[in-house]
From Swiss-Prot:
The gene is MTR3. Non-catalytic component of the RNA exosome complex which has 3'->5' exoribonuclease activity and participates in a multitude of cellular RNA processing and degradation events. In the nucleus, the RNA exosome complex is involved in proper maturation of stable RNA species such as rRNA, snRNA and snoRNA, in the elimination of RNA processing by-products and non-coding 'pervasive' transcripts, such as antisense RNA species and cryptic unstable transcripts (CUTs), and of mRNAs with processing defects, thereby limiting or excluding their export to the cytoplasm. It is found in: Cytoplasm; Nucleus, Nucleolus. Signal peptide: none annotated. Residues 1-44 are annotated as: Disordered. It comes from Saccharomyces cerevisiae (strain ATCC 204508 / S288c). This is Exosome complex component MTR3. One of its GO terms (cellular component) is nuclear exosome (RNase complex). Present with 7380 molecules/cell in log phase SD medium. One of its GO terms (molecular function) is RNA binding.
């Protein structure tokens, strides 16, 4: 016995299935955040990205490439997170700078740079807004390579390594600033820095205030000349950070 399911709505016996023509779906093009500073600055190109790590509060990627060097930094921000124990009237910041797979820099150098960065961002982050809270910042040096293959002796190589780690500091500051902004952490101002022959100067407030000064061992130069060169780089990096954050919002 043929029993028909009366709950189903059946069409006519001669009905045919509908046929659809092949259509192309338009996929909107993603906006590029690759930014190149104007000027000579050793023909250095910068690529800035934010918000690409899901399991943290804020993240940033800074890729820098010049004719002789290439660097890639990833920064992850966790917090503000409550601190158990005694009450603190303002938040605390911890910054850890870690090597990538190459293990290029020793631990003491990285700790020294981390302490320098903490001094800067203790002045930049509005810690009074985060009582009894901690903000943990991790900077990973994922790629750092010298593109020149010139053979060097041990002394020259040691000086080059010292110069390279000082040239990393402005990119660390840029990456941390972008990651903090991505995490929604309140900042007094956007911090940036420039480097000139081993001297690093970090600025805020359009270059009117210095929040950090780093000087490698080496030949002493005219500090005013280094200051002007660092300030010029700071203004360039600051404009790039603002453009990056504006592009992420649109």
């Amino acid at each position: 016995m043929n029993v028909q399911d009366r709950r189903r709505l059946l069409g006519p016996a001669a009905a045919k299935p509908m046929a659809f023509s092949n259509t192309t779906t338009h996929v909107p093009e993603k906006k590029s955040t690759d930014l190149t500073p104007k000027g000579n600055e050793s023909e250095q190109e910068l690529s800035l990205h934010t918000g690409f790590i899901e399991n943290c509060n804020g993240s940033a990627l800074v890729e820098a490439r010049s004719l002789g060097h290439q660097t890639s930094l990833i920064t992850a921000v966790y917090g503000p997170r409550s601190i158990r124990g005694s009450f603190t009237s303002q938040g605390t910041i911890s910054i850890q700078l870690k090597n990538g797979l190459l293990e290029k820099y020793n631990t003491n150098e990285l700790k020294e740079v981390s302490s320098f960065l903490m001094g800067i961002f203790n002045s930049v982050v509005n810690l009074s807004r985060y009582p009894k809270s901690g903000i943990d910042i991790f900077v990973y040096l994922t790629y750092d390579k010298d593109l020149t293959n010139n053979p060097q002796d041990d002394d020259s190589q040691s000086k080059m390594m010292s110069s390279q780690i000082s040239s990393l500091i402005p990119h660390c500051i840029t990456s941390i600033t972008l990651a903090l902004a991505d995490a929604g952490i309140e900042l007094v101002d956007m911090a940036g820095a420039g480097e000139a022959n081993g001297t690093v100067v970090s600025f805020i407030k359009n270059g009117e205030e210095i929040v950090g000064f780093w000087k490698d061992d080496g030949d002493d130069e005219d500090l005013l000349e280094c200051l002007d060169r660092c300030k010029e780089q700071y203004n360039r990096y600051r404009d790039l950070m603002i453009s990056c954050l504006m592009n992420q919002e649109t």
